[in-house]
Amino acid sequence: MSIIKEFKEFAVKGNVMDLAVGVIIGGAFSKIVDSVVKDLIMPVIGVLTGGLDFSNKFVLLGTIPPTFKGNPDSFKDLQAAGVAAFGYGSFITVAINFVILAFIIFLMVKFINKLRKPEEAAPAATPEDIVLLREIRDSLKQR
């Protein structure tokens, strides 16, 4: 069997196609979760915390150079200028994304496992020798 033919069988018959579909759907689903967190959850958290915007929360680790022309309160401007800053707000947003995504995947796996539960097996057929012995017993009882 040629290597190309073996690869075709592997790619088509194996789990490679399932994995590819999963990765594509996962990428699209992650964008949905990002939007839910960014556009729905974080604004509510911002309102509950008095207008706090997590995406721009950081701790300055270095000094701002005198030639810096951006906004010193903007994490993105500081990053673009190469200033060392610890962006914990961005991390909080990503952590919330992860928790939501992990929970949704957990629910999906749980649902799929529930669908996969095997139906209770019908009782196994009685072996022929047992059936024969019962017939003999019943026949002897009748005499």
UniProtKB/Swiss-Prot annotation:
Compartments (UniProt record): Cell inner membrane
GO molecular function: mechanosensitive monoatomic ion channel activity
Topology in membrane: Multi-pass membrane protein
Keywords for the protein's UniProt record, in alphabetical order: Cell inner membrane, Cell membrane, Ion channel, Ion transport, Membrane, Transmembrane, Transmembrane helix, Transport
A GO cellular component entry from the record: plasma membrane
Entries under PROSITE patterns matching the protein: MSCL
Entries under Pfam families matching the protein: MscL
InterPro entries found in the cross-reference section: Mechanosensitive_channel_CS, MS_channel, MSC/AndL, MscL_channel
Segments crossing the lipid bilayer: 10-30, 89-109
Cross-referenced SUPFAM superfamilies: Gated mechanosensitive channel
Source superkingdom: Bacteria
HAMAP family in the record: MscL
Family: Belongs to the MscL family.
Function: Channel that opens in response to stretch forces in the membrane lipid bilayer. May participate in the regulation of osmotic pressure changes within the cell.
Subunit structure, as described in the record: Homopentamer.
Protein name (Swiss-Prot/TrEMBL): Large-conductance mechanosensitive channel
